[in-house]
């Protein structure tokens, strides 16, 4: 129990846009938000998938913080934990995870019943729910597309936190469900070859790559998380 509590506390600290909204790091997330909003000029972005090349690159932290800054804009936001293998969104917001995405896909609950309100105004969360034995099959079902359609009809912005795209097929399955995708790469950790393969994988599943975010780059000696999110680092395809 102590280990789980510590993990949750660490995740909570990483949602810096909520805990320290005036910090430099939070401002970088708002810059990313603006880039996402203007990434597609032909239509409004209603849903975005956040993924990474490999585990541990910060995609869940990025998804949580982006959800918060969109909500702080006054938009009605839904953050969906679609990482059905190693879900963490519920720990970030200290939510129960007995009912969630898997419950909805298995028709054990409606989306309305499964969604939970967060402590951030305008931000709701659909946690992963119980980890299933067949994540890819669930995510590729027609029920997933129906859920995405229902979510986009009810919310101004829907953000999907998905598994790393090179690790499993799940992110590729969801690639054409969301209006666009954002690739998170870790400074000093993600190899160029891995980033290139991740980009190719997104192209293969016909996902509209909005850009890439460099995570973990020190902005200053006072920056604990070191988040790169300026226009130059939000790289268009």
From Swiss-Prot:
EC assignment: 2.7.10.2
EC top class, as a word: transferase
Modification comment: Autophosphorylated in vitro, which inhibits ATPase activity. Dephosphorylated by YwqE in vitro.
SUPFAM superfamilies: P-loop containing nucleoside triphosphate hydrolases (SSF52540)
Reaction it catalyzes: L-tyrosyl-[protein] + ATP = O-phospho-L-tyrosyl-[protein] + ADP + H(+)
UniProt KW keywords: ATP-binding, Capsule biogenesis/degradation, Exopolysaccharide synthesis, Kinase, Nucleotide-binding, Phosphoprotein, Transferase, Tyrosine-protein kinase
Positions of modified residues (Phosphotyrosine): 228
Record annotation: effect of changing residue 83 to A: Abolishes ATPase activity
Any one GO molecular function term: ATP binding
Marked site (Required for activity) residue numbers: 81, 83
Biological processes, Gene Ontology terms: polysaccharide biosynthetic process
Alphabetized CDD domains for the sequence: BY-kinase (cd05387)
Pfam family, one: AAA_31
Keyword set includes ATP-binding: yes
Role description: May be involved in the regulation of capsular polysaccharide biosynthesis. Autophosphorylates in vitro. Phosphorylates and activates in vitro two UDP-glucose dehydrogenases, YwqF and TuaD, as well as the DNA-binding proteins Ssb and SsbB.
Family of this protein: Belongs to the CpsD/CapB family.
Stated name of the protein: Tyrosine-protein kinase YwqD
Source organism (scientific name): Bacillus subtilis (strain 168)
Gene designation per UniProt: ywqD
